[in-house]
Amino acid sequence: FGTGASLIAQELSEKLGVPVYDKAYIEHELDGDSYATEAEVIKGLAEYPCIILGRCASEILKDQPNVFNVYVCADKEDRIERIMKKESLSHDEAKEMLEKNDAERADYYYENTGKVWGDVNNYHMILDTTKLGIENCADILIRYFERVEII
């Protein structure tokens, strides 16, 4: 939240021609089928090339071929600034929202995987948008996917 991951995903989606699925989309899919679990929805989406943001997809899809897990991070102040702009909030409001969201994400990830959210061992690549910038992060991923012929 506030790292720019959704912006990177959108840029990749446009350049690679693959859809992006986020929390809202996955929750919408669950509403349509009361028997489906979130993991089943994510596995179904991953049968075709796509980008899945969050939702423990790194753990759910860890044994699937052609899955590449990326963790996008940024300095706390950069994240707060992005949230302030996107949500039209004060610094304190954005900071509170960020801290609440991070705590919820960490709890959700641990409850569903037994692992620590953000642990580098759960991902193939870590990208820091504070250091690299959003466009450079997207370019790094595109170059990598071209090199390993995923695209």
What would you call each of these model-derived segments?
Residues V148-I151:
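C-terminal helical "lid" subdomain and adjoining coupling/linker elements of P-loop NTPases
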Residues F1-L12:
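Glycine-rich phosphate-binding P-loop
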Residues S13-Y21:
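Post-Walker A helix-loop "phosphate-sensing" segment adjacent to the P-loop in P-loop NTPases
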Residues A24-P49, C56:
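ATP-dependent small-molecule kinase phosphotransfer cores
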Residues A36, S90-E135:
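Small-molecule kinase domains that catalyze NTP-dependent phosphoryl transfer to phosphate-bearing small molecules
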Residues A138-F145:
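Short amphipathic C-terminal alpha-helix that caps PH/PH-like domains
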Residues V20, V67-N69, H124-I126:
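Conserved beta-strand scaffold positions in the cores of enzyme catalytic domains, especially
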Residues G44-E87:
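ATP-dependent NMP and nucleoside kinases share a basic, alpha-helical "lid"
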